[in-house]
Amino acid sequence: IGASIIASDASFAFGAGLVTIVLQNEKNIPCHIMQSKSVSDNCTAIALGMGLGEIESLKLEEILQLNIPKVLDADIFYNPLIVKYLDENVVLTPHPKEFISLLKLTNIANISIEELQENRFLYVEKFCKIYPKVTLLLKGANVIISQNKNMYINTFGSQKLSKGGSGDILTGLISSLLAQG
């Protein structure tokens, strides 16, 4: 739940307005974040995956089927259900280990971290060629952002961003932008 709170706080701070965490059981969360057992009908964007752990496949599929912008992160990259939703406009924010899992789930490659790190651009290009609607943001020392045939590299990374929670903040910021249109 901590990762979800971090992402929600970031989304709220970045201007998303009403932010809700979907939980099966009520938890003690900050008062500016709502909680619900289901996704609201007026939801304009979803961030999914942080602290996901073991969620019922039916519930996960129900959320993934919603026709609203999504940013997917963390545990979602280990769930085979994700493959069904890669043909739509979605933002993915994996770190290298999560991207390796995604490559394996999509049958693109079964590689090691070392192989990925040596050929990051190649595997990003392969993935985005097969899934051109996906916006992929591969985290690392130099973040690679790619969609279809376009690829951008952010060379302004910092060791300070390799701390736990920084990816959750990034997911919250992206979901806030998606929610605001």
How would you label these PLM feature ranges?
Residues 1-71, 76-91, 96, 100-181:
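Small-residue (G/A/S/T)-rich helix-start motifs and N-terminal tracts that mark the onset
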